[in-house]
Amino acid sequence: MDELLKILGANALESRANIARMLNVPAAEVDARIAAYEKLGVIRGYQAILDEDKLDLDTVTAVIEVKVTPQREGGFNTIADRISKFPEVRSAYLMSGAYDLLLFVEGKNLRQVATFVSEKLSPLDGVLSTSTHFMLKTYKRFGVLMHQETSDERLSVAP
C-alpha cells in the first residue's frame, strides 16, 4: 500500500505539511496525490471514530447475519445492494460461512431494530433467514481501543 495511504489511514487529520515531511516530497504533491485518490474513489471519505459511551447516545447497534438466495443475474450483489440502501444499515459485508451477509444496523431502541428485521429485511425476496445479535459494549473500533486502562494493576494469570 502507498505510504501516503498508510499515513492517512492512521490519522486523516495529519497536516499536509507533516505528511510532506514524512514522505520527503513537496506539499503540493501530497495535495495532488490525495485529490487523485479521491477522484479515483480510493479514498471514499473521512470519518471520526467516536466513543459512543462518552456521548451517551440513545442508539442500539445490532449485528445481523443474513442467509440469502443468490439471484440468477446478479448473484449476491443484487440483494446486498438492495439491503445496503436501507438507512438503518450502517455497514454490509459478503461473508463465507453459514450466513451470506453480515450487517451492522442502528436504531433508536431494540423495538426499532426488531421492526427493521421483521418488516423490512425478512420479507425481502431472497432473504431466507436472519440471526440478530445486539452489541452490548465496544472494546475496539477500527483499530482504536475504546476503553484505556487507567491503573497499573496487572491482570492475574490463572495456572
Regions found by a protein language model. Name each.
Residues 1-159:
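A compositional/biophysical signature of low hydrophobicity enriched in polar/charged and small residues
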